[in-house]
């Protein structure tokens, strides 16, 4: 028998019995939290026009998208991200007076692993989007939803890391490097590759942003990390982002979530649409 007839494509897998049960149970728990908090479900097509992601501020490398063509020769992609299609829905199907809008999704995304690191090509995502609202209250709304979802999963020990996209963006902008070099720096910060980051930044030692960028992978821990970060820069955009993150952190601590929070200023995601608070849990 041809080996392609008995195996799955690279980055995919079959799920059987107990694995399916755990996956569906977790999905039900999280979506029930989202429904309780007033989020309504949307489902976007698994196949989208390539242009949707080419024109959006996603910065997702085109090599990571799984492509095909339709009968007219137009390029299609398997959905690599859920936020961008939801933004398309908001701009084409939702009236401005309906905002703010609370939407959630539970669907798979597909990304080719060009790094060769063995990452999954097909990834299930459950997420929430709060459209037409911003500021501290909106961020705290989404973050408290995340904490509630983690608690609902009966996790005794978990952490949610907090960062701010504006810190890296402001520092890299002041450095004045090409997009290719900026991406190398971002990858080093995100992976906490201190040695490689130091090698790249050596050419920019005289720049004001040098010390802060070099320190970013090490700036994780409790609230003291924010004070350390403030001592490394005088850039008003960076200090404003740090102060905002400090406000969010203090509010979450006052709400009783402090033991589950870790500050990580090395969070630097590839998606350009991240502009403010970022977080991830584990």
Residue map of PLM features:
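A short beta-strand-loop structural module common to alpha/beta enzyme folds
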Residues: 40-46
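Short glycine/threonine-rich loop-to-helix capping motif typified by GTGT followed
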Residues: 169-179, 272-279
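Positively charged, Gly/Ser-enriched RNA/tRNA-binding surfaces
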Residues: 19-37, 48-49, 68, 72-73, ...
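Short, conserved phosphate-binding/catalytic loop or strand-edge motifs used
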Residues: 120-126, 162-170
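Short, surface-exposed recognition loops or helix-turn segments adjacent to catalytic cores
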Residues: 157-167, 185, 262-268
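Auxiliary tRNA-acceptor-end handling modules of aminoacyl-tRNA synthetases
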Residues: 1-20
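Glycine-rich loop at the start of a catalytic domain that most often binds anionic cofactors/ligands
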Residues: 52-65
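Acidic, His- and aromatic-enriched active-site or binding-groove loops in soluble protein domains
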Residues: 64-71, 176-206, 257
């Amino acid at each position: 028998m041809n080996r392609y007839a008995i195996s799955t494509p690279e980055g995919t897998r079959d799920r059987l019995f107990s694995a399916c049960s755990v996956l569906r149970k977790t999905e039900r728990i999280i979506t029930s939290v989202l429904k309780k908090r007033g989020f309504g479900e949307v489902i976007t097509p698994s196949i989208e026009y390539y242009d949707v992601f080419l024109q959006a501020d996603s910065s997702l490398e085109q090599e990571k998208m799984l492509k095909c063509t339709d009968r007219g020769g137009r390029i299609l992609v398997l959905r690599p991200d859920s936020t961008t299609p939801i933004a398309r829905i908001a701009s084409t199907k939702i009236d401005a007076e309906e905002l703010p809008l609370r939407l959630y999704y539970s669907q798979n995304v597909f990304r080719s692993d060009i790094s060769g690191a063995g990452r999954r090509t097909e990834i299930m995502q459950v997420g929430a989007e709060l459209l037409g609202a911003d500021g501290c209250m909106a961020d705290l709304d989404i973050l408290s939803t995340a904490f509630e979802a983690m608690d609902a999963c009966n996790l005794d020990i978990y952490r949610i890391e907090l960062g701010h996209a504006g810190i890296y963006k402001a520092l890299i902008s002041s450095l004045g490097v090409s997009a290719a070099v900026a991406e190398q720096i971002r990858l080093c910060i995100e992976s906490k590759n201190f040695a490689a980051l130091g090698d790249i930044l050596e050419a920019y030692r005289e720049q004001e942003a040098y010390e802060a960028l070099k320190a970013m992978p090490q700036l994780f821990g409790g609230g003291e990390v924010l004070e350390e970060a403030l001592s490394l820069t005088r850039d008003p955009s960076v200090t404003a982002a740090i102060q905002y993150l400090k406000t969010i952190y203090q509010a979450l601590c006052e709400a009783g979530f402090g033991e589950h929070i870790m500050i990580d200023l090395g969070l630097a995601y590839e998606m350009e649409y991240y502009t403010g608070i970022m977080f991830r849990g584990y």
